Amino acid sequence: MPLQVGRYAIYQLDSTNFYHYGQLDTLTQYLAKDSVESFFVDTPGDTSWVVVRYLSPATGTPVWTANETNVVNASSRSVDLTENNLRFIKLAYPMQNGITWSGNSYIPDDPYDSYGFTAPKNVNLSDWTYTYQNVNQPFTAGGKTYDSAVTILQVDDSSNVNISIIVDTSFASRTYWSETYAKDVGLVYRNTILWDYQPPPPQTTQSGYKIGFKITLTLLDHN
């Protein structure tokens, strides 16, 4: 969204968590409202904006509850987002097709250690290379087409996911993250997939299991 106090964006948030031994995929749906609530000027003289995310049940009249506070830092070099205490370099300049940068250079190793990932791209996010795609092209999200948008492919890596059935003895993983921003609007779509499939130990009756998460954000409304 444009960075100005009082601006907001409302998203459909679909969150899927993959759990260990129950092999249960749990989908939770929310409305998420990102609201620009204040700003400050940091030591280098760049402006940082405080964005509060509110969540509401996806159905019925929205009842907003503050969930997290994030910070967007805008400079002449980049736009950084600190989300859940992780700082991402979301946009870099110049904004041209094929331009790449290390968007996770501030991210420590294994930031999602609670999941127990072992796939290298799920552990070492600093190895990701962000790439601009489809600069100034139309993009459709939430039933609306935006005339000028840009997609950032942050990572697209996989192991053994193209076979129709994962063999019990095979390790598999998926690491994918892309975001699309529309001109004068901001983030309109985010798709995040990080999971490992762990095969069962040999000569046991224990089943294999998937660990990780999938999150999509789709813009519904903004001011």
Regions found by a protein language model. Give the residues of each.
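Conserved functional acidic sites
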Residues: 1-223
